[in-house]
From Swiss-Prot:
This is NAD-dependent malic enzyme, mitochondrial. Keywords: Cytoplasm, Metal-binding, Mitochondrion, NAD, Nucleus, Oxidoreductase, Transit peptide. InterPro entries: Aminoacid_DH-like_N_sf (IPR046346), Malic_enzyme_CS (IPR015884), Malic_N_dom (IPR012301), Malic_N_dom_sf (IPR037062), Malic_NAD-bd (IPR012302), Malic_OxRdtase (IPR001891), NAD(P)-bd_dom_sf (IPR036291). The lineage of its organism: Eukaryota, Fungi, Dikarya, Basidiomycota, Agaricomycotina. PROSITE patterns: MALIC_ENZYMES. The keyword NAD applies. NAD-dependent mitochondrial malic enzyme that catalyzes the oxidative decarboxylation of malate to pyruvate. The active site is at residues 138, 212. Fumarate binds at residue 93. (S)-malate binds at residues 194, 458, 502.
C-alpha cells in the first residue's frame, strides 16, 4: 500500500507546526523530534505513518494561530502585521461561536479543535462555562463522539498502542519517556470495550480518555501538560464499526481475556517504570476484564478503576445524604435501609461493594452489610438456585452478591423483586432506557415516604428514569440522582434540582490527592475517604435545599476537599511519601490542595 508521508517544521517564534505533504512515497525521519502543545509532549518516531501508527501526535494544530498580545515575539512578516488580539477577545469570540453551533456534537468537535490548538483558551472557556460545557466535552455528548470517532477524526489526541505492539511496549515507552520535558502525572487508559452504556467502540474509546482528562484539568486542577490519554487497541467485536471503511483501528475481532491480560501486564509494567510518579486510571473496560485488572494491579501499581471505585465512591456519597433524609422522614434507623440494584456489571457490583461501607459505618459486619443488597441482572435476581449459578456459568464478579435466602423461588423482573424485598432504595446501572417502569416507581413511592431512586446509567439515552417522570410518579417525594445531567424541573410551584451522581465529583480529587500525597498505591480506604469528603462538601444552603451533591459550579473547591480527604487517608494507611503534608488537619490540607491546582 502506498503511504503519503509528511514532514514537520517548528518555528521557534510562534511554536507553530505545519504539515507539509511530501512528493516522495517514502517516509524518512533520521532522528526523533519533540513537540509540546496541549496536554503533553509527544515524540515523532520512525514508526509513524498514516496507517495505524504506534505513536501518534497529540495536539498538533493544522494551521498557524493568529498572533495574540501574549506572544513572546512578534511574527516576522513582510506584509502588514496582523492585528493584536487579546486573550479576552479570543475567549468572547469562542463563546459566541459555540452559541451559534446547532448541535452538541458540533460543539464537541469544535472544542476538541480548540483544545489541540490553544489549550489555554479551551480551559479558560471551560473555567467560565463549566456547567454548560461539561455535558458537551463529556457525558452525554462524548458517547456520540466515541461512536463516530473515526468519522469526525481530525487528528491524533494521545497515545495509541495496539496488540501487535505487545512485545515492544517497554521499548516504546522507554524511548518515549526519555524525550519528555514534562512527565505525565495522570494517564487515563481504556481498551474501548465498554464505553459508557454503548458497548464495544474499539479505538473510539480514545474519546473517553481525552474527555476524562479534560475534566481532570477543568475540575481537579491537574496541569494539562501532565495528562496523557491512552487507548489500547485490541480489536473490536462491533462489526458495524469494524467494517466501516473510515474506521482507523485494528480491523479484527477483540482478543480474548488471556491475551488481553498479557498486553495489560506489559503496559502496566512499562508505564509504571517509564512514568514512576504517575497515577493510572482504568476506564471503560468490559466487566470481567475490569475486575480482573483491578484485582491484579491494585496492590502493585498506583492505579484505580473509575467505573468500579469512582462510581462506588460518588454513589456512596449521595446515598449518605439520601439515607439520612429518608430516615428522618420515616423514622427508621439508617441500618434498616434495603437497596435493590438493576444491573449486574462491573459498575453495579463496584458501587454495591462501596455502599456496603455505609452499613458498616452503622455497626453492621461485612456479611450483614452484604445482606442489605439485592442485585438483578438480565436473568433476574441473582440467587443460589438460579440455573446459571448452579451450573457455574455466572460471571465471577457477580458471585459476591448471590442471595441464599429465597428458598428456591426466582424473581425474574424488577417489579417482582420490589414486591419481595420492599426496598428503600433503587439503583440503576442496567444501561437500559426507561427500565424503571411507572409501576415500579409508583410502588417505591407507596412503600416509602421518601423513596431513594438513582438511575445512574450513562448517557441519557441509556438512563433508567427521567427526572420529570420520577417527580410525577412519586408526587415529588423522590430523592433522585442520575448519572447524566437533567435540567431542574418546576413541580407544584417549586423549582426542583436533580442530583447528579457524576464521577466528575470524585475522580479528579482521587487522582489529584494521590499525586499530591506521592502515594505508593491507591487504597480502598482512600476511595471510601473520597466519598465521605464529597458528602461533607455540601454547603448549608445545598443541604437546606435537599441536594444530595454539591453543585457542579463549585467543582474546584469540591475537588480540593476530596483530594484533602484522600491525602489524609493515604497518610493513615501509610502509603504517602510527601512528608510536607503530614501533620496538617483537613482544613489545612484543603488549602494546600487549592494552592496546588493549575489555572489557565
Amino acid at each position: 500500500m502506498t503511504r503519503t508521508p509528511f514532514t514537520l517544521s517548528l518555528r521557534s517564534t510562534d511554536s507553530v507546526f505545519k504539515i507539509r505533504q511530501s512528493l516522495s512515497t517514502v517516509l524518512s525521519h533520521s532522528s526523533t523530534k519533540i513537540i509540546s502543545r496541549g496536554y503533553i509532549t509527544i515524540p515523532i518516531t520512525s514508526t509513524i505513518a498514516y496507517h495505524r501508527p504506534t505513536i501518534r501526535l497529540f495536539n498538533m494544530p493544522i494551521a498557524a494561530p493568529v498572533r495574540t498580545l501574549s506572544s513572546s515575539q512578534p511574527l516576522k512578516r513582510s506584509t502588514s502585521p496582523l492585528p493584536a488580539i487579546t486573550p479576552a477577545q479570543n475567549l468572547l469570540r469562542l463563546k459566541a461561536h459555540l452559541q451559534n453551533l446547532p448541535t452538541p456534537l458540533l460543539k464537541h468537535v469544535h472544542l476538541s479543535k480548540i483544545r489541540r490548538e490553544d489549550p489555554n483558551l479551551f480551559f479558560s472557556v471551560m473555567r467560565d462555562e463549566l456547567t454548560d460545557l461539561a455535558p458537551i466535552v463529556y457525558t452525554p455528548t462524548v458517547g456520540e463522539a466515541c461512536q463516530k470517532y473515526s468519522q469526525i477524526y481530525s487528528g491524533p489526541e494521545g497515545l495509541y498502542l495496539n496488540i501487535e505492539d505487545k512485545d515492544r511496549i517497554p521499548e516504546i515507552l522507554r524511548q518515549y519517556a526519555s524525550k519528555l520535558v514534562t512527565p505525565p502525572q495522570i494517564l487515563v487508559v481504556t481498551d474501548g470495550s465498554r464505553i459508557l452504556g454503548l458497548g464495544d467502540l474499539g479505538i473510539g474509546g480514545m474519546g473517553i480518555s481525552v474527555g476524562k482528562l479534560n475534566l481532570y484539568v477543568a475540575g481537579g486542577g491537574v496541569n494539562p501538560h501532565g495528562c496523557l490519554p491512552v487507548v489500547l487497541d485490541m480489536g473490536t467485536n462491533n462489526e458495524t464499526i469494524r467494517n466501516d471503511p473510515l474506521y482507523i483501528g485494528l480491523k479484527q475481532s477483540r482478543v480474548g481475556l488471556e491475551e488481553a491480560t498479557e498486553f495489560m501486564d506489559a503496559f502496566m509494567a512499562a508505564a509504571s517504570e517509564a512514568f514512576p510518579k504517575a497515577v493510572i486510571q482504568h476506564e471503560d473496560f468490559y466487566s470481567e476484564a475490569a475486575f480482573d485488572f483491578l484485582a491484579r494491579y491494585k496492590e502493585k501499581y498506583r492505579m484505580f478503576n473509575d467505573d468500579i471505585e469512582g462510581t462506588g465512591s460518588v454513589i456512596l456519597a449521595g446515598f449518605l445524604a439520601a439515607a439520612k433524609q429518608a430516615s428522618e422522614a420515616s423514622g427508621k434507623p439508617l441500618r434498616d435501609h434495603k437497596v435493590v440494584f438493576l444491573g449486574g456489571g462491573s459498575a453495579a457490583v463496584g458501587v454495591a461493594k462501596e455502599m456496603m461501607n455505609f452499613f458498616m459505618m452503622q455497626g453492621l459486619t461485612e456479611d450483614e452489610a452484604r445482606e442489605r443488597f439485592w442485585l438483578i441482572d438480565t436473568k433476574g435476581l441473582i440467587t443460589s438456585t438460579r440455573a446459571d449459578v448452579v451450573s457455574g456459568k455466572i460471571a465471577s464478579h457477580k458471585k459476591f452478591f448471590i442471595r441464599n435466602d429465597t428458598e428456591g423461588k426466582e424473581y425474574p423482573s424488577l417489579e417482582s423483586v420490589i414486591e419481595y424485598v420492599q426496598p428503600t432504595a433503587l439503583v440503576g446501572l442496567s444501561t437500559t432506557f426507561g427500565a424503571f417502569s411507572e409501576f415500579a416507581v409508583r410502588r417505591m413511592a407507596e412503600l416509602n415516604q421518601s423513596p431513594i431512586i438513582f438511575p445512574l446509567s450513562n448517557p441519557t439515552s441509556k438512563c433508567e428514569l427521567a427526572f420529570s417522570d420520577a417527580l410525577e410518579w412519586t408526587d415529588g417525594r423522590v430523592l433522585f440522582a442520575s448519572g447524566s445531567p437533567y435540567p431542574p424541573q418546576q413541580f407544584k410551584g417549586t423549582l426542583r434540582e436533580p442530583g447528579q451522581g457524576n464521577n466528575f465529583l470524585v475522580f479528579p480529587g482521587i487522582g489529584f490527592g494521590a499525586l499530591q500525597a506521592g502515594c505508593k498505591r491507591i487504597t480502598t480506604g482512600m476511595i471510601t475517604a473520597s466519598a465521605i469528603a464529597l458528602s461533607e462538601a455540601l454547603t448549608p444552603e445545598e443541604k437546606q435545599k435537599g441536594l444530595l451533591y454539591p453543585r457542579l459550579e463549585r467543582i474546584r473547591a469540591v475537588s480540593a476537599r476530596v483530594a484533602a480527604g484522600v491525602v489524609k487517608q493515604a497518610q493513615e494507611d501509610g502509603v504517602d511519601t510527601n512528608e510536607t503534608l503530614r501533620g496538617l488537619d483537613i482544613e489545612a490540607l484543603t488549602e494546600e490542595m487549592n494552592k496546588a491546582q493549575w489555572w489557565p
